[in-house]
Curated annotation (Swiss-Prot):
GO cellular component: cytosol; fungal-type vacuole lumen; multivesicular body; nucleus; NVT complex
Record's keyword annotation contains Hydrolase: yes
SUPFAM superfamilies reported in the protein's UniProt record: ARM repeat (SSF48371), Leukotriene A4 hydrolase N-terminal domain (SSF63737), Metalloproteases ('zincins'), catalytic domain (SSF55486)
Record field: transmembrane: none
Descriptive protein name: Leucine aminopeptidase 2
Compartmental location: Cytoplasm; Nucleus
EC number: 3.4.11.-, 3.3.2.10
GO molecular function: aminopeptidase activity; epoxide hydrolase activity; metallopeptidase activity; zinc ion binding
Cofactors: Zn(2+)
SMART domains linked to this entry: Leuk-A4-hydro_C
Domain of life of the organism encoding this protein: Eukaryota
Chain residues that bind Zn(2+): 331, 335, 354
Length: 656
């Protein structure tokens, strides 16, 4: 279980610091709080890898994979074309996790290797020793034969009974440290390479690259060939195979999914994706990846989306039948610049990926739907951040913006809304104090141009910020950097435009006032409220309405069962009958908060239909808070339908 995924420092192999490069030697003098926290080298070393990545440059990577649904394994070969950076280096160290390594070759000659004992959570270090140091050329090819195992955390396998088509399905999820469970690699966001992939399967395959050709092997399998011309880190690799069909949703975009979902997906995404791309290009610079496709995955997919280049992996909970959840696509698209082109060098600085991406996502949405929409989304995000921090087991550690995972803590354990929403709020604050978008937008272009195809730490970002706004040094010096970056808890709240929220807050306050005044019978409330109150609310406004009701500490809904039931009855069409997963989850949270016992088994049944951790983890926590036996029994029944990461984290939540 993940609560045990922490190793002693004595088990940790500290990376060897690289030689100081030009970027390291020319650092800006930052405010003292930042200067004191600055790592000795920039970018900071990644302590979540056992590889000696700093000794090599990966020029290119070739993947040759076979997918076996019968055995639930992926096997094959990976070949790295490498240059030595450290000329004295005489061994190669790679990351693996639950892999079988069959062979290792350097320039076509077999060499000895040693697979070290597994140390949780980072896996088993693979050490490759050439016969002599001189046999390791300055440029060489490293080829490894391998196979995944039944314990693989990188893949989820579904049999035909678990899919709508009756055919098996497999998909990968490699962020943060699970690429090492798919193939031996330098599993760190600090290094990138171009990729070619040849993947053989009995069913269609998608990959994080552009398809080049499909070869029919004449034995019931086909080999799908892909090319990724932009250098990417290993965690961005995405693979899925199953009964997949596709439809066009824009001039450079397709959606892939199971056949029964195709029409719904085409309707949900058509017309909007290209608008998002064009809006993003105006804010940053032209899209570099060629195509932008979307894979709508099976129900058990654990995240809202994963920014695999050229092929965004998305949750089916985005299909809301009203386009109200499509902002997630704006988020994953924004990753094409923040995260995929410009990447955090380690998971300590994850906010550089996600905070920037949320910021760009909301700028994209604002360009299409108006500035008030951006601020409204930020308000919902603020509530998500507050809920996330309040639910943390260890908020003192995991609610700071810059993390310290250098003791080998699993980055999955630190996953929360903090890097997303706290990161966004910092960038929004900087935009505001520096003069608004007109002043901040040139910096956006400069930052993403400067670090394109590179990895960096937070301090390199701050160097660039202070250099660019040298004429506004006093403004930047006045920022409370300690609170924003290093203190746990909520950040200072920016001033948001509340135009789209005012009616929501007003209605929620009216409900609170009626209840406080003792008007709690069904007749009383039906005289004060009607379905027309929210008929013009969009799904996001309904989400905020339900959030606000639950967060009002003056009203203990568990003491007002009749009022809670009446609210749901009055707004049944907009709330109870909603097919939007965001609304459905908030409805269950409201019902659980009110301790409406009839909702307990209904929530348990819903947890069998979703795999997205945004809903599954808090769903089990809610159920556990009111009916622990039901929560445990539900998880025991359903645990094997969830992704391995989701399963492990829910187990941890229930054991807390």
């Amino acid at each position: 279980m993940l609560s045990q995924f922490t190793r002693s420092l004595s088990c940790f192999v500290k990376p060897t610091p690289p030689k100081l490069n030009k970027l390291t030697r020319t650092m800006t003098v930052l405010p003292k709080i930042l200067q004191d926290a600055r790592p000795k080298v920039s970018p900071e070393l990644d302590y979540s890898t056992y590889s000696n990545y700093q000794n090599f440059k990966i020029n290119h990577t070739d993947l040759n994979l076979n997918i076996s649904f019968d055995d639930s394994i992926v096997n094959g070969f990976v070949t790295f074309n490498l240059n030595k950076i450290d000329k004295s280096c005489n061994e190669i160290r790679l990351d693996t996790s639950f892999l079988t390594v069959d062979s290792v070759e350097i320039d076509d000659a077999k060499v000895d290797f040693q697979l070290k004992d597994r140390l949780e959570p980072l896996g088993s270090q693979l050490i490759i020793n050439p016969p002599t140091a001189t046999s390791l050329n300055n440029e060489f090819n490293l080829k490894l034969g391998f196979s995944t195992t039944k314990d693989c955390t990188a893949l989820q396998w579904l049999n035909g009974e678990q899919t709508s088509s009756g055919k098996p399905y497999v998909f990968s999820q490699l962020e943060a440290i699970h690429a090492r469970a798919l193939f031996p690699c330098f599993d760190t966001p600090s290094v990138k390479s171009t990729f070619n992939a040849a993947i053989t399967s009995t069913l269609p395959v998608v990959f994080s690259g552009i398809e080049q050709s499909v070869v029919d092997n004449g034995n019931g399998t086909k080999t799908y060939n892909f090319k990724q011309s932009v250098p990417i880190p290993a965690y961005l690799i995405g693979i899925a195979s199953g009964d997949l069909v596709s439809g066009e949703i824009g001039p450079r975009s397709k959606v892939y999914t199971e056949p029964f979902r195709l029409k719904d997906c085409e309707w949900e995404f058509s017309g909007d994706v290209e608008k998002f791309i064009q809006a993003a290009e105006k804010i940053i610079f032209p899209y570099e990846w060629g195509t932008y496709d979307i894979l709508v995955n099976v129900n058990s997919y654990p995240y809202g989306g994963m920014e695999s280049p050229n092929m965004t992996f998305a949750t089916p909970t985005l299909i809301a039948y009203d386009k109200s959840n499509i902002d997630v696509i704006a988020h994953e698209l924004a990753h094409s610049w923040s995260g995929n082109l410009v990447t955090n060098c380690s998971w300590n600085h994850f906010w550089l990926n996600e905070g920037w991406t949320v910021y760009l996502e909301r700028r994209i949405v604002a360009a299409i739907h108006g500035e008030a929409t951006r601020h409204f989304s930020a308000l919902i995000g603020w509530n998500d951040l507050a809920n996330s921090i309040s639910a943390m087991k260890n908020p003192d550690r995991f609610s700071t913006l810059i993390q310290n995972l250098n003791d080998g803590t699993d980055p999955d354990e630190a996953f929360s809304s903090v890097p997303y929403e706290k990161g966004f709020n910092l960038l929004f604050h900087l935009e505001t104090i520096l003069g608004g978008p007109k002043e901040f937008d040139p910096f956006i272009k400069h930052y993403f141009t400067k670090f394109s195809k590179k990895s960096l730490d937070s301090y390199q970002f701050f160097d660039t910020l202070f250099e660019f706004f040298a004429d506004k040094r006093e403004i930047l010096d006045a920022v409370d950097w300690e609170t924003w970056l290093y203190k746990p808890g909520m950040p200072p709240k920016p001033k948001f435009i509340t135009t789209l929220a005012d009616n929501v807050y007003s209605l929620a306050e009216k409900w609170a006032t009626e209840i406080k005044n003792g008007n709690t019978t069904e007749d009383d409330l039906k005289q004060a409220f009607t379905a027309a109150d929210i008929k013009d609310f969009n799904s996001n406004q309904i989400v905020l309405f339900l959030d606000t009701l639950v967060q009002n500490k003056e009203i203990q809904w568990n003491n007002h069962h009749t009022a809670a039931k009446t609210l749901l009855k009055i707004y049944e069409d907009s709330i109870v009958k909603s097919r939007n997963a965001e609304v459905v989850f908030r409805t269950y949270r409201f019902e659980i908060t009110a301790q409406l016992k009839e909702s307990y088994p209904q929530l348990a049944e819903w947890l069998a239909t979703v795999g997205r951790m945004k809903f599954v983890r808090p769903g089990y926590r809610l159920l556990n808070s009111v009916d622990r036996p039901l929560a445990l029994a539900t998880f025991e029944k359903l645990q094997n339908i969830y992704h391995p990461i989701c399963k492990a984290l829910v187990k941890q939540d229930l054991e807390a």
